[in-house]
Amino acid sequence: MEYNKLLADMVPGDRVEGFYILKEGAIKTSNSGKPFLSATVTDKSGSLDLKAWDYSGPVGAPTDAGKVVKIRADVTEYRGSIQLTASNVRMATQEDSYDVSALVPVAPIDRDETLEKVRSLIASMEDRDYRVLAETMLERHLETFRSIPAAKSVHHSFLSGLLMHTANMLCLADFLAGQYSQIIDRSLLLTGTLLHDFAKEKEFTFSQLGVVTDYSRKGQLLGHLVMGAQEIAQVAAELGTPEEKSLLLQHMILSHHGEPEFGAAVKPMFAEADLLSQIDMLDSRMEIYAETLPGVPAGTFSSRIFALDKRIYHHE
């Protein structure tokens, strides 16, 4: 029996016991009519599916997502994927002792240095209206911006993921603004890039460890695009930002998913909005590669990745 082994290090045949985060889980009924737990557990190294047969609780309520559980399980393989077959699953208690830093994945960045890079790029914007709006909203969102994940599961779904994702995008935006300077307003592009996901702090609910557990009521009814555009309109009005500049930024937020089928309220209708959408897609997709490839042996293909709608190849 191995204790608190990282999920990424587990191989079929291992017997493990330890503490992990319940990402999601539900009690279901098998074909034979017996209850079982179907769940996903995570730690800082990744995630694995878990099954506990002939199991009716206590773990499995919707409110359990994001909490720490203790499991005892065999590591097995099913249809080419490693999973856990648990003989015991319970909620962690106050009497239990576990290392939180081993459970929660954190962005591989220096947060202070990355935030300073963001501040420097914003301070370098020539347009005062955009610069003041960007700096004002950054200060209002600072604590959550530097700490929350960028997504629930698809990309940058670790602590400080939003900071990492946004900083990456700002560097790309800065370069591309110079590359296409004849048509790109750099200050507009950088401001839209900074603000594009700020409303995710309202879109998600978070566990006590800071992990995204679900979409909030507002997140489901409105989404971060609409809430983000609404806040920009409000703050711009407070600051006296010209209406045209506020409108351009709102459009960038509402359109940054590119196509309605991907959640955009409208399609991008000017160069900076289109470029923001492309930059967002680029960094998101590259992060999916970065998170997937370490688990794919060189010279082989991954399983199908839903967000990419394909398998990917890990070349030598």
Where do the model's predicted regions map?
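Divalent metal-coordination and catalytic microenvironments
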Residues: Y20, G66, M169, I253, ...
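Extended, charge-rich, solvent-exposed interface segments
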Residues: Q83-P149
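OB-fold single-stranded nucleic acid-binding module
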Residues: G25-P35, L48, Y55-S101
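OB-fold nucleic-acid-binding modules
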Residues: M1-V16
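Short, acidic/hydrophobic/Gly-rich beta-strand patch recurrent on exposed beta strands
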Residues: S38-D43, F206
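Divalent metal-dependent catalytic cores for phosphoryl transfer on phosphate-bearing substrates
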Residues: V154-H156, M164, F175-V296
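N-terminal intrinsically disordered, cationic/polar leader segments
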Residues: S277, P294-G295, G299-E316
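A short mid-domain helix/strand-loop element embedded in enzyme catalytic domains
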Residues: Y130-D174, L195-A199, E203
